C-alpha cells in the first residue's frame, strides 16, 4: 500500500495467479545425511589405514577410489572457477582441496604404491591439507560442514602412506 497524506491506495491494481501451484511431496530421500556419509567415509579410511599398517602393504585400490573421486570433483571445481561467469564462483577456495592434480598424478601414485616406493606426493598433500584446514576459519567463503571431515579423510590417507613408508624403511 502507498500512503500519501490522508489517502491510502494499493501498490498494485489487482492480483491474478497465473499458476496455482502446490508443493510436491518429494517423499523419502537418501536415508543418511551428508555429514553421516562423510563420517562413514572417515571410518572406512581409518579401517583401511589400520589394515594397511597391519599388513604393511598399501591397498592401492582405495587410493584409486579416494584420490580419483577427489580429482574428478576437482575437475568440476576447476571448470567452474575458470569458465563460470558467476561472480561468486571465481574465488572458490575449494580448489585448494578439490583440484585435478590427484587425478593427473593417480597412475604414478598407484604404480609407486604397487612397487612399494616412497611417494613425496603424500608428504606434500599433508602440508596442503593441513594448511587448508588451518586457514579455513579465516576465509570469507562459507563452507559446508562436511568439507572439514572430507579434508580430514584425505589427510588420514596421506598420513597413513607416510607412516607406512617410514615404518618400512626403519625396520
Task: Please annotate each region the language model reported.
Residues 19-88, 94:
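Core alpha-helical transmembrane segments of integral membrane proteins
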Residues 45-50, 71-171:
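Generic detector of multi-pass transmembrane helix bundles and their immediately adjacent loops
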Residues 1-24:
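Soluble extramembrane regions of membrane proteins in the secretory/endomembrane system
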Amino acid at each position: 500500500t502507498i500512503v500519501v497524506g490522508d489517502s491510502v491506495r494499493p501498490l498494485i491494481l489487482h492480483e491474478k495467479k497465473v499458476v496455482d501451484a502446490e508443493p510436491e511431496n518429494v517423499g523419502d530421500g537418501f536415508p543418511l545425511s551428508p555429514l553421516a556419509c562423510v563420517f562413514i567415509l572417515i571410518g572406512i579410511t581409518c579401517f583401511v589405514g589400520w589394515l594397511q599398517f597391519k599388513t604393511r602393504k598399501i591397498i592401492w585400490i582405495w587410493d584409486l577410489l579416494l584420490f580419483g573421486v577427489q580429482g574428478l570433483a576437482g575437475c568440476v571445481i576447476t571448470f567452474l572457477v575458470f569458465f563460470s561467469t558467476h561472480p561468486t564462483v571465481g574465488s572458490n577456495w575449494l580448489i585448494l582441496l578439490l583440484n585435478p592434480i590427484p587425478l593427473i598424478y593417480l597412475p604414478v601414485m598407484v604404480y609407486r604404491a604397487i612397487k612399494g616406493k616412497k611417494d613425496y606426493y603424500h608428504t606434500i598433500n599433508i602440508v596442503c591439507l593441513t594448511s587448508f584446514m588451518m586457514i579455513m576459519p579465516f576465509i570469507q567463503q562459507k563452507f559446508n560442514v562436511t568439507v572439514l571431515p572430507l579434508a580430514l579423510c584425505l589427510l588420514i590417507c596421506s598420513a597413513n602412506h607416510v607412516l607406512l613408508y617410514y615404518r618400512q624403511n626403519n625396520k
